[in-house]
A protein has these predicted regions:
Chain B
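Conserved acidic carboxylate
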Residues: 12
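Short amphipathic alpha-helix used as the core "switch/output" element in two-component signaling
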Residues: 63-77
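Two-component/phosphorelay signaling modules centered on CheY-like receiver
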Residues: 15-34
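Non-catalytic signal-transmission and effector/linker regions of two-component phosphorelay proteins
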Residues: 1-7, 40, 105-119
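A Lys-centered signature of the CheY-like receiver
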Residues: 102
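Active-site residues of response regulator receiver
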Residues: 57
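Acidic, metal-coordinating helix/loop segments flanking the phosphotransfer/catalytic sites
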Residues: 35-53
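Hydrophobic/aromatic residues positioned on beta-strands within the core alpha/beta folds
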Residues: 80-82
């Protein structure tokens, strides 16, 4: 069996990876959405800030304009005073001083620049010339209210600004009436907007000199603002460095009356901090969500992968037939797998127990039957032999496997080609079963016969895949078969030989007894004698018979009639062929005695005695047939069947035959050799 | 009857059969010049014996007839077998010789003799 690739276990990714991917897929859009929302809120905030800057700027400008309108209105009201028209300066001074209060002062300058009234100082102490000649010059060209830039007042000795209107007499500028104002008023105006903390509003004059600020008024009053700020486009929020060189969002606007610039700014660090905070928050969210998602995925992945790994290990153990233990899991599907594994183990255990029992029975049966088994794998050209087969072959475990050709090594060389051809034919022919018989040469040199029966297992296309067979040592059967065949051959021969003897008996009897009834009697007698000799031989499996038995059987009929017959001699075995011949001879002698000799009368006596003397080559038997008390004997006149048979039979036995027709009774001496009994 | 006067040599151990064969041959007009009941006896007699045809038993008192058959074949003498065994028992070199299966009739014997004797 091909070993499954170990790489498969490394293929694919852990369930935790998929869980992480799933979590990331789910949370990533959420995190992106949060990011987008955060970004949107930051940009919205930014937008709102910008809008707010614009609004604040507009409000400031409007406030400034309104303030100036009011101041101009005050000035215009004063300019219509009859006291001014009447040029009653002390009264006008008093009126003005009273009307303006402490935060502002009135300066009236004649067209030639000479100060007429200055309410900052007591009447009559006004400086000679104006401190704000620029406003006078402007008004001379265009008689309209003028808002001055910051200048240092001659009387206040501090930076101040003027709001001035022309006082006309006809088309001629007569006086310039100015309201002297301290920048603190502007600061108050700026601060009156109650800006959020960190916001800064500032005003600088047409020369780019700071007039008022919500913060650091004292420090920066009268200082010039950086040039890039003066060049800013109005009503546009830009990000640039402020007066302190810090990044800020800044917008500027110009008022209706003055060429002053109002500036509102707030530090970019605020915006940046918001952005940074949002980014920080977003990053923290990502880290937190991502971390917890991955952590949870790993955790869940472990609850998933751990029992899976346990199930995998259990499945491996199941495959190897080793024990395993698996715990219940919180996951239903894995419990189903575990259950399936336990069931499989249970079934396998039962199955393998049954299989073991079966195998045991089969092996016992095969051993009892002395069957050797073999299995030939056609594809790999490999034969596997069972231990019992190896026992039959007299081989050891080294021969447990072999190729097709090497498997034939045990076959007897004479049978090898036949067996090889037969086995090759088995693989190709359509039948699936086969039976062969051949000889094998065992390792110990013994030659044994085996029967090899088996079956070919094929694939669907009919190609042979395996051959499974059993081998049985049939040497004993084969030898028995051979013995039996020999026995049959021998039997066939003996029957034919006996028939030939019967034929000879018939032909010989016919020559001396041509009359049918006489022939029948004589032939039957001789057949009977032959039959009794055969019976004797059959008793000892045709190995032969004892001489005692041969003689007793030949004479049994006469002994039964009560004749005096004396039989006796040494114990000696006569071989089969000689037994028949000797029986027929004794039968002829007895027949003759019954007709003409001692057995024909009641007082006749017969003695058959013998000795058996062993010599180097064989045993010499010396048998004496002696008749007494019968009628007088005379030699036969013609050669009878009996005498011819005796002569030729003696020759057959290699015997010396002496016949003595003595008057007292026939004497017959027969000396013949029999083989010494085998060991 | 041209078998008349044919001189025959017999090797046969069974006395009765030997006698009967002898009678049959004489009935056919043959002359049995000699017979042997053992192989060694046959080989001894063959040295100086003059005859026309031999009738041989195959298993002679436990000894195979092979040396006798070989000797006769070597001399180019005609002979036939008379045996109770089948053809498979004949000497390998003489498997194709005429075989008279026991028991046989006189007519069988005559035909067998005719088939081995030169015409």
């Amino acid at each position: 069996m091909a070993k499954p690739a170990a790489d498969t276990a490394r293929k694919g990714h852990s369930a935790a990876v998929y869980l992480i991917a799933f979590a990331v897929a789910v949370t990533l859009p959420l995190l992106l959405l949060v990011g987008a929302l955060l970004y949107r809120s930051v940009t919205l905030e930014n937008e709102q800030n910008k809008q707010r800057i614009g609004q604040v700027l507009q409000a400031l400008v409007a406030d400034l304009d309104r303030d100036m309108d009011r101041r101009i209105a005050v000035l215009e009201t004063l300019s219509t005073s009859p006291l001014l028209v009447a040029e009653d300066w002390p009264a006008f001074y008093a009126q003005a001083k009273q009307g303006l209060g402490s935060r502002a002062y009135l300066v009236l300058v004649a067209a030639d620049g000479r100060q007429v009234i200055n309410t900052y100082v007591p009447y009559g102490e006004a400086p000679k010339m104006t401190g704000d000649p620029a406003s006078l010059q402007k008004m001379k060209q265009d008689p309209r209210p003028v808002i001055s830039d910051l200048f240092t007042s001659l009387v206040v000795r501090k930076p101040v600004y003027n709001i001035s209107i022309p006082v006309m007499r006809g088309n001629e500028l007569r006086y310039v009436m100015s309201l002297g104002l301290l920048p603190e008023d502007l600061r108050d105006l700026l601060q009156g907007q109650s800006l959020p903390p960190n916001w800064t509003a500032a005003i600088w004059d047409g020369n780019g000199v700071t007039m008022a600020r919500t913060h650091d008024q004292e420090r920066l009053l009268g200082t010039a603002v950086p040039k890039h700020l003066t060049e800013l486009k109005p009503q546009t929020v830009v990000r640039t460095t402020n007066i302190d060189g810090q990044e800020a969002l800044i917008a500027v606007a110009r008022g209706h009356w003055s060429n002053w610039t109002v500036d509102v700014s707030f530090p970019a660090t605020l915006v940046d901090r918001q952005l940074n905070d949002s980014l920080l928050f977003w990053g923290a969210t990502i880290l937190l969500v991502g971390g917890s998602v991955v952590g949870l995925a790993l955790l869940f992945g472990r609850t998933l992968t751990r029992p899976l790994a346990a199930a995998t290990a259990a499945a491996g153990a199941l495959g190897r037939g080793e024990p395993f233990a698996i715990r219940d899991s919180p996951i239903r599907e894995i419990n189903a797998v575990n259950d399936a594994l336990r069931r499989a183990r249970h079934d396998l255990d039962e199955g393998s127990a049954a299989l073991r029992d079966n195998e045991e029975r089969l092996r016992t049966a095969a051993e009892a039957a002395q069957f050797g088994a073999h299995e030939y794998d056609v594809v790999r050209d490999r034969t596997h032999r069972s231990p019992q087969f190896l026992k039959i072959l007299g081989a050891d475990d080294a021969d447990a496997t072999a190729t097709f050709e090497a498997g034939l090594d045990f076959v007897h060389p004479d049978d090898r080609d036949m067996t090889r051809r037969a086995k090759q034919r088995i693989l190709q022919r359509p039948e699936d079963r086969y039976q062969l018989e051949y000889r094998i040469c065992r390792r110990d040199g013994q030659i044994r016969w085996v029967m090899d029966r088996g079956q070919v297992i094929r694939d669907k296309a009919g190609a042979a895949l395996r051959v499974i067979g059993v081998v049985l040592d049939i040497t004993d059967i084969k030898e028995a078969e051979q013995r039996q065949r020999l026995l049959f051959d021998e039997l066939n021969h003996r029957v034919k030989n006996t028939l030939a003897i019967v034929q000879a008996l018939a032909l010989q009897t016919l020559q001396t007894r041509p009359k049918p009834d006489e022939f029948a009697d004589a032939f039957s007698d001789r057949l009977g004698s032959l039959a009794r000799a055969h019976s004797l031989l059959t008793e000892d499996s045709w190995r032969g018979a004892s001489l005692q038995d041969i003689v007793a059987t030949a004479l049994s009929a006469f002994k039964d009639e009560g004749r005096s017959i004396d039989i006796g001699g040494d114990a000696v075995m006569v071989p089969a062929g000689a037994t028949v011949t000797l029986s027929l001879m004794l039968h002829e002698l007895a027949t003759n005695a019954a007709k003409y000799g001692a057995l024909s009368v009641a007082e006749g006596r017969l003695a058959v005695r013998w000795t058996a003397v062993p010599s180097a080559a064989n045993i010499m038997v010396d048998l004496h047939w002696e008749e007494d008390g019968g009628p007088p004997v005379s030699p036969p006149t013609r050669k009878s069947f009996g005498s011819r048979l005796l002569a030729s039979s003696a020759r057959q036995l290699g015997a010396e035959l002496d016949l003595d027709f003595a008057a007292s009774g026939l004497r017959c001496r027969l000396r013949f050799p029999v083989p010494r009994p085998g060991p | 009857m041209h078998l008349a006067g044919t001189r025959v040599f017999i090797v046969e151990d069974e006395a009765l059969i030997l006698d009967t064969l002898q009678d049959m041959l004489e009935a056919l007009g043959c002359h049995v010049v000699a017979s042997a009941v053992r192989v060694d006896e046959a080989l001894t007699k063959l040295v100086s014996l003059d005859f026309d045809v031999a009738v041989l038993d195959v298993n002679v008192a436990g000894t195979r007839i092979d040396p006798v058959a070989d000797l006769l074949a070597g001399r180019g003498m005609p002979f036939l077998f008379a045996s109770g065994y089948g053809r498979g028992s004949l000497p390998m070199a003489h498997r194709e010789r005429v075989l008279l299966t026991k028991p046989y009739r006189t007519a069988d014997l005559r035909a067998a003799l005719h088939s081995v004797l030169p015409q």
